[in-house]
Curated annotation (Swiss-Prot):
This is Movement protein BC1. Its main location: host cell. The lineage of its organism: Viruses, Monodnaviria, Shotokuvirae, Cressdnaviricota, Repensiviricetes. Transports viral genome to neighboring plant cells directly through plasmosdesmata, without any budding. The movement protein allows efficient cell to cell propagation, by bypassing the host cell wall barrier. Begomovirus genome is shuttled out of nucleus by Nuclear shuttle protein (NSP) and the movement protein transports the DNA-NSP complex to cell plasmodesmata and facilitates further movement across the cell wall. One of its GO terms (biological process) is transport of virus in host, cell to cell. It comes from Bean golden yellow mosaic virus (isolate Puerto Rico-Japan).
């Protein structure tokens, strides 16, 4: 169901800019649009209204030779966005094609900020010299104000081709897609019952199992989904004595390093003597002495 304003917005009549000549450029060059007067903007601002573009028409009238080639690209940018995300809509058409471009806005903007809409053009793959006054542009804007913003049904940009030798197969235009949205849960105490609390802080008499997500709730103990997410949920019911893993590896290593094993000198000599004798007896072959006759 389309959202509607409780009170119809105050609509301005179409505000037309002059039909001015523009020089051919391979870089983005601004097309000057005529916006409501400063007095009108101040009046809307004092009434605490916001504004949107209901309809924007860009008229293109070429003035190049019949053998001119190339494409004209017209872009609408919203300067509230970062430079690489400001493009809202674009049109591409032959340089010799007289055409009207139509754009419908999908958002409001605040009159406390500079008007964010900018219109640019550039020419590519052309055999016409740069800085040649190749065409005339004229912009027409219809704006409206409202006490507050509402959801605006999307309307795609369109074109009206005025040159008979061209058709919609020679034209291309596009509109930016909706921004991607990803839900990000806020970790707070109010969500602790869902196992989404922040860093665990143990207090005297508490165990890690009773404070962590494996034992925070008993209301969903019979839920298969909850059991799959937290398979050790009820581990805290076993008691701290069962959950105690014992001394850590560092403690055991320190204890081993501190163990006292003492031997007297006589005991150490006896161990060495017996070890040497054992080696001699096991590895030396006894040779019978030869008698002299």
């Amino acid at each position: 169901m389309d959202s509607q304003l409780a009170n119809p917005p105050n609509a301005f009549n179409y505000i037309e800019s002059h039909r001015d000549e523009y020089q051919l450029s391979h870089d983005l060059t601004e097309i000057i649009l005529q916006f409501p007067s400063t007095a009108s903007q101040l009046s809307a601002r004092f009434s605490r209204s916001c504004m949107k573009i209901d309809h924007c028409v860009i008229e293109y009238r070429q003035q190049v030779p019949i053998n001119a080639t190339g494409s004209v690209v017209v872009e609408i940018h919203d300067k509230r966005m970062t430079d690489n995300e400001s493009l809202q809509a674009s049109w591409t058409f032959p340089i010799r094609c007289n055409i009207d471009l139509h754009y419908f806005s999908s958002s409001f903007f605040s009159l406390k900020d500079p008007i964010p809409w900018k219109l640019y053009y550039r020419v590519s793959d052309t055999n016409v010299h740069q800085r040649t006054h190749f065409a005339k542009f004229k912009g027409k804007l219809k704006l409206s104000t409202a006490k507050h913003s509402v959801d605006i049904p999307f309307r795609a940009p369109t074109v009206k081709i005025l040159s008979k030798q061209f058709s919609n197969k020679d034209i291309d235009f596009s509109h930016v897609d909706y921004g991607k949205w990803e839900r990000k849960l806020i970790r707070s105490a109010s969500l602790s019952k869902y196992g989404l609390q922040g860093p665990i802080e143990l207090k005297p008499g508490e165990s890690w199992a009773s404070k962590s997500t494996i034992g925070v709730s008993h209301l969903d103990a019979d839920s298969d989904l909850d059991s799959a997410i937290h398979p050790y949920k009820n581990l805290n019911r076993l008691g701290s004595s069962v959950l105690d893993p014992g001394d850590s590896a560092s403690i055991i290593g320190a204890q081993r390093a501190q163990s006292n094993i003492t031997l007297s000198i006589a005991q150490l000599n006896e161990i060495v003597r017996s070890t040497v004798n054992e080696c001699i007896n096991n590895n030396c072959i006894h040779v019978q002495p030869k008698s002299l006759k």
